[in-house]
Design a protein with these regions (language model features):
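Short, structured coil segments at secondary-structure junctions
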Residues: 22, 56-57
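Short catalytic-loop micro-motif centered on adjacent basic/acidic residues
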Residues: 2-4, 60-63, 120
């Protein structure tokens, strides 16, 4: 296990890539994710880092929305046959999930039978999506919210499950 602020992930990129190529069972813990660390200024806002890690073949990337997802993310990282990047926020986040989204890659956390739109978030933005869904509902727009902590894990699910999350 190794860790640093997420904005410094670029300094670790060669080691992360080599770990993925060699299927090394390493857990990289990155903290201080999201624009929620605004008081540190733009040099400490890791805007593009998540996308760049997600394209490394063999690297499992998990960005939990809350402590429930973080617990399950650790379980998944400990059993994954290769490296995992756990991308964690700095700020305290409300509990918005039961944690199962991590196992499946994505899960509906706010369901509306009459949803006109689906808001998708990862990490700290899931709670923002939940708040946005409430505001939309007050304006007469029904919305569902999906937490998607791991694109790769979601893509591995059967099409029936994927279609149930995104009808």
């Amino acid at each position: 296990v190794g860790g640093t602020f997420f904005v410094f992930a670029d300094y670790m990129r060669p080691a992360i890539r080599l770990a993925a190529l060699s299927k090394a069972r390493i857990i990289f813990v990155f903290t201080h994710d999201s624009v929620g660390v605004g008081e540190d200024g733009p040099t400490h806002q890791p805007i593009e880092h998540l996308a760049s890690l997600r394209v490394i073949p063999g690297l499992q990337v998990i960005r939990p929305a809350d402590s429930n997802e973080t617990k399950v993310a650790w379980e998944c990282a400990l059993t994954y046959p290769g490296p995992t990047a756990l991308v964690l926020s700095r700020q305290s986040l409300p509990i918005t999930t039961d944690g199962d989204a991590v196992r499946y890659g994505a899960e509906i956390v706010v369901e509306s039978a009459k949803a006109q739109i689906v808001l998708v978030g990862t990490g700290s933005e899931v709670s923002v999506c939940v708040d946005a869904a409430k505001l939309l509902k007050d304006s007469g727009v029904e919305a569902s919210v999906v937490s998607m902590p791991s694109f790769d894990r979601f893509e591995m699910q059967p099409s029936q499950y994927r279609d149930s999350v995104f009808p």
